[in-house]
Structures are given as structure tokens and as C-alpha cells.
A protein has these predicted regions:
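N-terminal periplasmic/intermembrane-space "pro-region" immediately following the signal or transit peptide
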Residues: 2-64, 71-73, 413
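Small side chains
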Residues: 5, 11-13, 138, 194, ...
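Short secondary-structure boundary/hinge segments and terminal tails
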Residues: 44-45, 118, 295
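Outer membrane beta-barrel
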Residues: 49-214, 223-241, 245, 250, ...
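Outer-membrane beta-barrel pore domains
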Residues: 82-83, 126-133, 144, 240-413
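Short, contiguous, pocket-lining structural segments
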Residues: 184, 221-228, 264-268, 275
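Exposed aromatic-hydrophobic patches
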Residues: 218
Length: 413
């Protein structure tokens, strides 16, 4: 049997009508024999969708295996304490999903993360419709997906410069626990992502969603039923090897549980997130500012608070021939909770924490090895994070230090 014939036999399980035509073509060109083609056909298994309207199905997968070593030391009330450290391997993400296209611009996407708990295993689940007219071009989404708030949050986790998201990003976007805000991340609702055909580089988006993230099928018991309204706008410019994008994201809800999903304090939140991105000659960087005006958000939920944060991140890729690319990466993050409070576990994933602080900062330095781009990537990084002050007194002489080493291997398919 020819080499091409053997390769075709190995892929027989994916045959369909188009593959039959391909086999006939290979026979007519003399690449394989008719007997070889018939043998491949006998061993093939047709995989077809249940509904006839489905035109194609695409498999989506991601596997991330991570090592983490996390050490936290707290200095509070005149004492120093080393908290229980972490030194383990974890399956960080195990995504498996599908995208089905039905024609006429309609599609549906469902992705599950088997590394999460059974209560929050959905990554995405939404229906989409492509729309294109003279003055209206974009895509409508209905379902569970990420809002456009906090650059690092809505950037795919497979494309992060760092292994985990930053102190400030996690504080603004992770689930509301009475300290974190829960503004970004995944919400159930209606989304529109559009562009202006007459103005190249100008994009925008709007969404109306539940105000609580990470709850795809219902809002938490006792939650306020008011919605969250979000919008974004950006302009991108590309000149040869240089591209730059500037934009701003906005979110507002007139009623969410600022005391956490189990709390009883419902109030309004307005959040803004201007940002800038730059790519030039191997350098890739971004920076954003996060700010939220929250009613009844601190001091036993009796006073307003204005948390704010800053992120700056960059990496530079060096080609190393057949071995891919190597990219040193750095990130700085700063957070001021304005008295709402933050624990180390709020900003550093899987860190242990006991004391609540006022503000904090972190520095990350690492190396990314793009063996086959993001499809096959290894990351190694160190992060130092420090929180200081007391929740109700930013000048209090107390702080917490975290030293974190992580390594992660990633495969996309």
C-alpha cells in the first residue's frame, strides 16, 4: 500500500460523503488502488448530527496541567503567621465542547470544563446569529458567555501572557463574595458584537445580562432580580508590523447584592475600564484601568466605595527555529479597595488567607515557550504579591506577602 493510502486508512473513522469523493479522486489519479479505497470505505464510520439542518460540527478542546507552589505569610495585630502552603499538581482546565453551524449565519456553542465543580462546569453555552447589512454588521449571541470587561478576563485563558490572571483582574471579575465585585466574567443574557463597515477598525458591543456571574441557569437564592447593562467601544489601527488598539468598557446595574451572593444588601454599581493594546516587532503589551462606583459597599455595607485597579503586562517573542518561540513575560498589578477589603485568596488563585486588607500590588515574571503557538505551550512563572493596611484603615501597620511559583503545560485541539 502507498504511503498516502496508509495515511488515508488511519483517518478512516472521520469519513463522510465528501471523503468518498476524495477517495474516488485519489483512485483516478493513481495515488491509491480501487481495492485500497474500498477497504478504507468498509472500515469507515459515518458521524452525522441528529438534526438535518446542521451543516457542520467542530470539536473544541483544551487541556492545561499546572504545578503550583504558594506560600503566604500574614503580619497582623502585632503577630506574624505563615499560612498552610500549597505544593501540588492540578488539572487547571479540561475543556471539551462543540460548535454547530446551521447555515444562514446561525450557530450554537457549548463548552464544558471538567476541572470545575458540578455546580459551575459550563464555560460557554450560547446561540449566535451573524448579521450583515449596509450599516449593521456583527454577531448576536444569546446565552452564557463573558461580558467585555477587564482586558485580562475576557482574553482567552489559552492566550494569557501569565499563567493566572492578576490581583486587580480577579478582584473585579471573580464571583462576588462581599469583597470581590463579580462585574466581569460569565453572565447569562443577550450580547451584540458589532463593527462599523464605513469606519475600518471601529468596533463596539452592548449586552443585557443577569447581574450575577457564574450562574448560568438561575440567579442565586435571595438575589436582586435587576439586570446588568454593559457596553464597549474600541478603535484599532495597523501600520505594517505595528498595531495599536484603544478602547473602553462599561457596566452598570441598578441592583446587585454588594454583600455577596448570600448577602441581603442590594445596591447599584457603575464600572468603567479603559485600556490600550500594542503589538510591534515581537513585542506584545496591554494596560488597563479598572474603577467601580459602588453604593453601600463598605463598613458593614453602610457606605459607598470606589475600588480601582491597574494592570500592565508585556511579553517579547524570540524565534528559535524549529523549536518555536521563547517569550519573556512580565506584569504589574495594583489594587485599592477604598475600604471594601481584600484577602490574598481574592487576588491570588488557591492562596490561603485569613486577614482582610485595604490595598495591594503584585509583580509577575516568567517565560513562555510557544512550541506550536498556543496550541502547544509551556509556561513557567514567579509572582510576588503584597497586601497592606486594614479594611477600614489603610494606614494600619499590617501586611501579607505571597510568593508563588507556577508551571503549566497546555494543549489546544
Amino acid at each position: 500500500m502507498t504511503i498516502l493510502g496508509a495515511a488515508a486508512l488511519c483517518s478512516a473513522g472521520a469519513l463522510n460523503a465528501q471523503d468518498r469523493q476524495t477517495l474516488d479522486l485519489l483512485v483516478s489519479k493513481g495515488v491509491i488502488t480501487r481495492a485500497e479505497a474500498d477497504n478504507i470505505g468498509k472500515n469507515s464510520v459515518a458521524i452525522t448530527p441528529k438534526q438535518k439542518a446542521v451543516k457542520s460540527i467542530k470539536l473544541i478542546g483544551r487541556v492545561q496541567t499546572q504545578y503550583e507552589n504558594i506560600n503566604v505569610r500574614e503580619y497582623a495585630n502585632g503577630t506574624s503567621e505563615s499560612l498552610t502552603s500549597k505544593n501540588d499538581f492540578i488539572m487547571r482546565r479540561m475543556f471539551l465542547g462543540m460548535e454547530a453551524k446551521l447555515g444562514a449565519g446561525w450557530s450554537a456553542t457549548v463548552i464544558a470544563d471538567f476541572a470545575r465543580s458540578s455546580d459551575n462546569y459550563l464555560e460557554y453555552a450560547y446561540i449566535s446569529k451573524d448579521v450583515e447589512y449596509d450599516f449593521l454588521k456583527g454577531k448576536l449571541h444569546l446565552g452564557y458567555k463573558k461580558t467585555t470587561f477587564a482586558v485580562e478576563e475576557y482574553m482567552s485563558a489559552s492566550k494569557l501572557f501569565t499563567i493566572e490572571r492578576s490581583l486587580a483582574t480577579r478582584y473585579f471579575t471573580e464571583g462576588n463574595n462581599g469583597r470581590r465585585l463579580g462585574i466581569g466574567g460569565r453572565h447569562t443574557g443577550v450580547y451584540w458584537d458589532g463593527s462599523i463597515p464605513q469606519i475600518e477598525g471601529l468596533t463596539y458591543g452592548v449586552s443585557v445580562t443577569n447581574s450575577y456571574n457564574n450562574n448560568p441557569t438561575s440567579i442565586p437564592a435571595g438575589a436582586d432580580n435587576n439586570l446588568m447593562y454593559s457596553a464597549n467601544v474600541a478603535y484599532a489601527l495597523k501600520l505594517d508590523d505595528v498595531s495599536i488598539q484603544a478602547g473602553a468598557n462599561f457596566s452598570y446595574t441598578n441592583g446587585t447584592n454588594v454583600a455577596g451572593t448570600a448577602g441581603t444588601v442590594h445596591a447599584e454599581v457603575l464600572a468603567v475600564n479603559p485600556y490600550i493594546k500594542l503589538k510591534a516587532f515581537g513585542l506584545d503589551m496591554w494596560a488597563d484601568f479598572l474603577l467601580a462606583d459602588m453604593k453601600d459597599a463598605k463598613n458593614a455595607f453602610s457606605q459607598n466605595a470606589t475600588p480601582m485597579g491597574v494592570n500592565v503586562a508585556a511579553e517579547y517573542k524570540f524565534d528559535i527555529g524549529e523549536f518555536g518561540q521563547i517569550a519573556p513575560a512580565v506584569r504589574y498589578s495594583w489594587i485599592d479597595t477604598d475600604g471594601r477589603g481584600i484577602k490574598m485568596s481574592d487576588g491570588v488563585r488557591n492562596a490561603n488567607a485569613e486577614t482582610t486588607y485595604y490595598a495591594g500590588q503584585s509583580v509577575y515574571a516568567g517565560i513562555n515557550w510557544y512550541i506550536k503557538g498556543n496550541d502547544l505551550k509551556f509556561q513557567l512563572g514567579y509572582e510576588w504579591a503584597q497586601l497592606n493596611g486594614a479594611a477600614n484603615n489603610k494606614h494600619a501597620a499590617q501586611h501579607s506577602d505571597a510568593n508563588v511559583v507556577r508551571a503549566q503545560m497546555q494543549v489546544l485541539f
